[in-house]
Regions:
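Bacterial Sec-dependent N-terminal signal peptides
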Residues: 1-26
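Beta-sheet ligand-binding and adhesion/scaffold domains
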Residues: 23-45, 52-59, 63, 73-170
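Short coil-to-beta strand junction motifs in C2/discoidin
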Residues: 68-71
Length: 170
């Protein structure tokens, strides 16, 4: 009976632990594209305001051996199973060689792994397919970092004079 009560209590508390995980902050790591077999830098900044998660992503792409970037606003949520769901909301800036298709959006489904010395988000990404483009898939692995000066995304906000976008966390 005692084991049953402990097991029941543990099952009731697990969802509370999942939803109490702190995901705000700056995350830096890599994005692996299954199609191109390229691993490139990837950054996320997540903030929470008025009970809602939002943020920004900074991703890089190689086209013809040249590196291009895109900075996007993202919507962030935590699914019932504890997965971190990140969806593109709007493309803010890029240096793409062609005008990007407005209908392509990326979806990340990440697991939050908490270790003694680091927090990691790891999982899959997929883009939707359109008439012109097929879907892309891949893998994202990012670690929470505290050194904002090491971040290309933070340097972008500083250059734009938009540090108030990230002041919630600093």
């Amino acid at each position: 009976m005692k084991k049953f009560l402990l097991s029941s209590l543990a099952l009731l508390l697990i969802p509370l632990l999942i939803f109490s995980q702190e995901i705000t902050g700056l995350w830096k790591g890599t994005m692996y594209n299954d199609s191109t077999k390229n691993t490139l830098p990837y950054e996320l900044f997540i903030k929470k305001e008025n009970g809602k998660y939002t943020g920004f992503s900074h991703s890089w792409f190689l086209i013809g051996g040249k590196e291009y970037y895109g900075i996007k606003e993202v919507k962030v949520s935590i699914a019932k199973d504890g997965k971190i769901v990140i969806k593109d909301a709007a493309l803010m800036e890029n240096n793409y060689p062609v005008l990007p298709d407005k209908n392509i959006h990326q979806l990340n489904i990440l697991d939050l792994l908490i270790r003694e010395d680091e927090n990691i988000m790891d999982g899959l990404f997929i883009t939707n397919c359109t008439k012109q483009f097929r879907e892309l898939t891949g893998h994202i692995n990012v670690k929470r970092i505290n050194t904002f000066s090491e971040s290309s995304l933070m340097q972008y906000f500083k250059k734009k004079g938009a540090e108030n976008e990230v002041a919630v966390i600093k």
